[in-house]
């Protein structure tokens, strides 16, 4: 489900895939070949969420922001099932493990494993 919020509509590349019951709200950009899986929520209501090319956000994960803390996910990143990512930066090629929590202001480098 795709929702406009405060006159901001998610921008989803036509080569991306979003599960029918995933929720994407507001200022969210999905680059090409991204995938958002079942029950994931991307809530760009406070700041922008940017998901880089080839990245995936798996089942039940939540991506959110706070004022002053946008969320940037690099290219070819995997966000595992039920992860909570909030107002952070995740570098290219990183893996955020199942159930991981990353909070405001965290900066994860390229090729990292968070678990």
Positions of predicted regions on the chain:
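Extreme N-terminal tail/first-helix region
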Residues: 1-16
